[in-house]
Design a protein with these regions (language model features):
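Residues at the starts of beta-strands that form the adenosine-phosphate
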Residues: 2, 25, 222
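Conserved mid-domain beta->alpha element of the FAD-binding
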Residues: 6-21, 25-32, 153-154, 181, ...
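Conserved N-terminal helical subregion
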Residues: 1-3, 20, 45-167, 171-184, ...
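C-terminal helical "tail/cap" subdomain of flavin- and related membrane-associated enzymes
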Residues: 1, 63, 78, 286, ...
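Short, flexible helix/strand-to-coil boundary loops that buttress conserved ligand/catalytic motifs
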Residues: 39, 55-56, 65, 84-85, ...
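Conserved FAD/dinucleotide-binding core of flavoprotein oxidoreductases
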Residues: 82-105, 136, 142-147, 186-273
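Catalytic P-loop NTPase motifs of RecA-like helicase/translocase cores
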Residues: 35-36, 161-162, 302-304
Length: 402
């Protein structure tokens, strides 16, 4: 089949590779004129990295990314609440990777061009809409002209034009008041060089992790960090810029944080470029598929970045879509794909609104009142593991059966 994909992000490119592997003719259309390796840190969870390994990208990932050993959840005083392992040594079939989002996107882009041809990704083509009938779908562009295909996959992100046409009466983005500041800084490594720290609580939170294997080989660490501050009276989401240069007033919220190996205020102050944006998602959709058109990735299920799951769910979408179309070509395959993925991602979106695996931070914050308190006296390991295991079940990354 000839399949058009709107969007050359991680989901759209992963779908291109998976669909090409099944013998389909794929054409990707990207709105921006020039693709650039934008973004900062991203995580690929074990279940999603298995898809990329299956596509033959494991060696390339190991050359650029960090194999995450564990996520350490800590109080603002530095207490270790829980260490949640994410590595093959802990029983996962594939590793979790922490890496630069742009490097992952360009790894996928290079592979698409190498396997499908240089013209497989057309930049400067914003998909603006579509029409369809029993025999095919016609894709239209903001720049004019059209493209005929058997299927259209809307992988065009948070502001998806394909989603907009499928659900024209959808309400505004969902925003509860958390602002996020992000940056990356090259510095000395912390911990073992493979650990992610998440500290604080639902109101004030700090996340950091290394994202570059190449920096590690030079004895340094490229540290990706995210600072989150929740406001009691948030402004409307539509008034909040998606991404802009961030102010530095938020740093005052983290002056009292105490982390082993990390001086958080110093890390924040030494970062040259800081971006700021609201934490936004959308309400889950009742359906993704209409005839020969379906949604994928952020276009289908934008979610809060709890559990580092957004890109991973898009990659899983790509594999399930290709497998479903291999069994049932055409609209029936799209419906089969949705039947598998929509319930899972809906559950993830709603769980992430409740903080996902990061609920352990709020459990600890409610009980730990100062640096002298002992976590082991206040919270049982079983209570913490229940949170972690529950989210692994929801998100679909389970350890191998022993």
């Amino acid at each position: 089949m000839k399949i058009a994909i709107a969007g050359a992000g991680i989901g759209g490119l992963a779908a291109s590779l998976c669909l090409h592997e099944k013998g389909h003719e794929v054409q990707v259309f990207e709105a921006v004129e020039t693709l650039q390796p934008l973004g900062v840190g991203i995580n690929v969870m074990p279940h999603a990295s298995g898809v990329l390994h299956g596509l033959g990208l494991g060696d390339a990932l190991d050359e650029m990314a960090i194999r995450t050993r564990a996520i350490e959840y800590r109080t603002r005083f530095g207490h270790l609440i829980q260490s949640d392992p994410r590595c093959v040594e802990a029983g996962f079939e594939y590793p979790q990777y922490s890496m630069h989002r742009g490097e992952l996107q360009f790894l996928l882009l290079d592979e698409v061009r190498a396997r499908l041809g240089e013209g497989a990704v057309m930049a400067g083509r914003m998909v603006s809409g579509f029409t369809q009938n029993e025999s095919g779908v016609r894709v239209s562009f903001a720049e004019g002209a059209a493209f005929d295909a058997d299927l259209l996959i809307g992988a065009d992100g948070f502001r998806s034009k394909v989603r907009q046409q499928l659900h024209p009466d959808e309400g505004p983005a969902h925003y509860e008041g958390t602002m996020m500041w992000r940056g990356a800084n090259l510095q000395a490594p912390f911990a073992d060089g493979r650990t992610m720290f998440i500290a604080g609580d639902h109101n004030v939170k700090f996340v950091c992790y290394p994202i570059s294997a190449r920096a590690g080989q030079e004895g340094k660490a490229l540290i990706n960090w995210v600072a989150e501050v929740r406001h009691d009276q948030p402004r409307a989401a539509e008034e909040a810029d998606w991404t802009r240069e961030g102010d530095r007033d938020f740093i005052a919220e983290f002056l009292g944080f105490q982390m082993p190996d990390i001086d958080i205020p110093a890390l924040l102050n030494s970062t040259q470029t800081i971006t700021q944006y609201p934490m936004i998602d959308r309400d889950p959709l009742p359906w993704w598929t209409q005839g020969r058109v379906a949604l994928l990735g952020d276009a289908a299920h934008p979610m809060y970045p709890m559990g580092a799951n957004g890109a991973s769910q898009a990659i899983i979408d790509a594999r399930v879509l290709a497998d479903a179309l291999a069994e049932q070509p055409g609209p029936e395959g799209l419906l089969a794909y949705e039947a598998v993925r929509r319930p899972v991602t809906t559950n993830v979106v709603l769980n992430n609104r409740k903080s996902g695996p990061e609920r352990v931070l709020d459990i600890a914050a409610a009980r730990v009142k100062g640096p002298e308190d002992r976590i082991e006296d206040l919270i049982s390991p079983a209570e913490l593991e229940e949170v972690a295991a529950s989210y692994r079940q929801v998100a679909g990354f389970l350890k191998k059966a022993v």
